[in-house]
Each structure stands twice: as C-alpha cells, then as structure tokens.
C-alpha cells in the first residue's frame, strides 16, 4: 500500500466518516430505502473507512505514530441522522469550514454540530502544534479510534477499538440475507468493483 522508507515515517492523523460511501452509489439505486442501495452503502462505507484509516495504519507497520478518527455524525448509528446522506464523504470539510452544498439536507449549524466542529478544529490544531491530536495512538494491539458524534446540543466522543477488519466486513457481506447471492454479485460488481475488489 505505502512504500516503507524513512521519508514516509511521519505522524499521521487519519479521519473518515461512518457512511463515507453514501454519495458514491449511483442514482439508479435510489430510493434510499432500496435494499440494494442500503447494501452498497453499508458495505461500501465499511470498506471505504477501513481502507482509508486502519489499512493505512497497518501498512505503516509502526514506522510512525498514527491516530484514527471516525465521524459518526449523520450516520445510521448517530444521535443525529441525516436521511439519505448519512455521515457523507466530505462532512469533515463541511464541519471544519462551515460551508456545505448540502445545507438544505444537512443542517450543520446546531449547537451540537458546532461543538463537533470545534472538537475537530482543536484536534487538528493540537496535532499540528504538538504532534498529537489528544487521544490514544493506534497500535496493532489497541486498534484505537476516536468516534465523534453530536446531537442538537452537544458533541460526544469515545475511544474504542476499530469496529471492522476487511475479513469481518467480507464475512458480514456473505452472511447478509437482505439480497440474494445474485443480487449481491451485481451490486458488488457495479458499485464496489474498482474500489475494493
């Protein structure tokens, strides 16, 4: 994944959103309640957040400190659900800048969203000035990830072990009974091939 040499041994802060893949599923899988779209978003998001965070940390093999963050805000398990969007790709930039082309669908002006924005800005400032964002570093043993969420009035964060592995995601896909095997194969070919397979 990444070449191992001294030039790549720099501290990294890797952030992803819970439903990173929600906007990448083609419109022909709409409506949002369609089982094929739900399958593509669920597992595409799991593979996307894993490959952009923990897979990178694993590939570095301890050559540099790594911190992982996962933005749950807006996703299916969030205190604030953003229907049809979830915790979409780019939500980090919207939270940091206050600018969003999703303003009609995703109100990021609530006290909770603003507190989450402040928490993210502080973590980035701390990382840039001190070399640490203020939570436990990821290691192969801890698999630490800071999960960030908000309701309408407050920000919430919790440190836990990273929720997935590539193997656990693939096993969940195989066990998922929401689609037939033929439907799964079609969805995986049309929407996940080229990303993860």
Give the residues covered by each predicted segment.
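Substrate-gating cap/lid region and adjacent catalytic-acid/histidine neighborhood
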Residues: 1-111, 130
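Alpha/beta-hydrolase-fold serine-hydrolase catalytic core, especially in secreted/extracellular enzymes
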Residues: 61-64, 75, 100, 104-197
């Amino acid at each position: 994944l990444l070449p191992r040499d001294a030039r790549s041994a720099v501290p990294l802060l890797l952030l992803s959103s819970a439903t990173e893949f929600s906007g990448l599923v083609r419109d022909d899988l709409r409506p949002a309640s369609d089982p094929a779209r739900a399958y593509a978003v669920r597992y595409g998001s799991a593979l996307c957040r894993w490959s952009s965070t923990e897979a990178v940390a694993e590939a570095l093999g301890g050559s540099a400190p790594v911190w992982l963050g996962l933005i749950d805000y807006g996703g299916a398990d969030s205190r604030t659900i953003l229907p049809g969007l979830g915790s979409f790709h780019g939500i980090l930039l919207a939270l940091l800048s206050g600018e969003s082309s999703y303003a009609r669908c995703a109100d990021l002006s609530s006290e909770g969203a603003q507190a989450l924005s402040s928490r993210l800005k502080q973590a980035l400032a701390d990382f840039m000035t001190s070399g640490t964002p203020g939570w436990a570093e990821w290691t192969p043993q801890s698999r630490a990830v800071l999960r960030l969420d908000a309701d309408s009035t407050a920000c919430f964060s919790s440190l836990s072990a990273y929720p997935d592995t590539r193997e656990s995601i693939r096993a969940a896909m195989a066990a998922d009974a929401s689609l037939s095997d033929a439907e799964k194969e079609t969805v995986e070919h049309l929407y996940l091939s080229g990303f993860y397979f």
